[in-house]
Amino acid sequence: MRSGRTVDEFGRQNNFAIEPQVVVAEADASWGFHDRAEKLNGRLAMIGFVALILTEVALGQGLLPFLASGLS
């Protein structure tokens, strides 16, 4: 370990604090906004959008009119 003492040109000791190494702690990757969650959310949104388009093509009408026709 490095000592925090130096001697200047006049022979006087200069004691100073040694700064610790800065360590960036990674956030907990199991919760919150992180790359894995954002990618999963985007992929699920794309799958849902494609499923909606395929449903509209198969039924010949939009999803909202189809749901409204079932209510009447």
Curated annotation (Swiss-Prot):
Asked whether the keyword NADP is assigned, the reply is no
At the top level of its lineage, which domain of life is listed? Bacteria
Q: Which UniProt keywords apply?
A: Membrane, Photosynthesis, Photosystem II, Pigment, Stress response, Thylakoid, Transmembrane, Transmembrane helix
The UniProt transmembrane annotation reads: 47-67
**Annotated membrane topology:** Single-pass membrane protein
Q: Name one GO biological process term.
A: photosynthesis
Q: Does the keyword tRNA-binding apply?
A: no
Which GO MF terms are attached to this record? Answer: pigment binding
List the GO cellular component terms.
photosystem II; plasma membrane-derived thylakoid membrane
The UniProt induction remark is:
Transcription is highly up-regulated 15 minutes after a shift to high light (500 umol photons/m(2)/s), declines by 2 hours to low levels. Upon a shift to low light (50 umol photons/m(2)/s) transcripts are rapidly degraded. Also transcribed in response to blue and UV-A light.
Q: What does the UniProt entry say about where the protein is found? A: Cellular thylakoid membrane
Q: Cite the SUPFAM superfamilies for this sequence.
A: Chlorophyll a-b binding protein
Q: What does this protein do?
A: A high light-inducible protein involved in photosystem II (PSII) assembly and/or repair under stress. Binds chlorophyll and carotenoids, protecting against photo-oxidation during PSII assembly.
Subunit:
Forms homodimers that associate with PSII assembly intermediates containing CP47 (psbB).
**Which family is this protein grouped under?**
Belongs to the Hlip family.
Q: What is this protein called?
A: High light-inducible protein HliA
